[in-house]
UniProtKB/Swiss-Prot annotation:
<dbReference type="InterPro" id="IPR018271">
    <property type="entry name" value="Ribosomal_uS14_CS"/>
</dbReference>
<keyword id="KW-0479">Metal-binding</keyword>
<dbReference type="GO" id="GO:0005737">
    <property type="term" value="C:cytoplasm"/>
</dbReference>
<keyword id="KW-0699">rRNA-binding</keyword>
<keyword id="KW-0694">RNA-binding</keyword>
<feature type="binding site">
    <location>
        <position position="27"/>
    </location>
    <ligand>
        <name>Zn(2+)</name>
    </ligand>
</feature>
<keyword id="KW-0687">Ribonucleoprotein</keyword>
<protein>
    <recommendedName>
        <fullName>Small ribosomal subunit protein uS14</fullName>
    </recommendedName>
</protein>
<feature type="binding site">
    <location>
        <position position="40"/>
    </location>
    <ligand>
        <name>Zn(2+)</name>
    </ligand>
</feature>
<dbReference type="InterPro" id="IPR023053">
    <property type="entry name" value="Ribosomal_uS14_bact"/>
</dbReference>
<keyword id="KW-0862">Zinc</keyword>
<dbReference type="InterPro" id="IPR001209">
    <property type="entry name" value="Ribosomal_uS14"/>
</dbReference>
<dbReference type="InterPro" id="IPR043140">
    <property type="entry name" value="Ribosomal_uS14_sf"/>
</dbReference>
<dbReference type="GO" id="GO:0008270">
    <property type="term" value="F:zinc ion binding"/>
</dbReference>
<dbReference type="GO" id="GO:0015935">
    <property type="term" value="C:small ribosomal subunit"/>
</dbReference>
<keyword id="KW-0689">Ribosomal protein</keyword>
<dbReference type="GO" id="GO:0006412">
    <property type="term" value="P:translation"/>
</dbReference>
Amino acid sequence: MARKSLIAKAKKRPKFKTRAYNRCKICGRSHAYLRKFGMCRICFRELAHEGKLPGVRKASW
């Protein structure tokens, strides 16, 4: 889990737009962020396996 101070820091609007970065809405992780879902790959995978993300299916080919 991300430190609470880093999560709070990311929520604040930065002085310059390029300093802004995305964090997972669930756990606060900054890496492996999926913009379409607003969460990191780990949270995405857990919720997808539980069936809590509508329209997401496991690939099979």
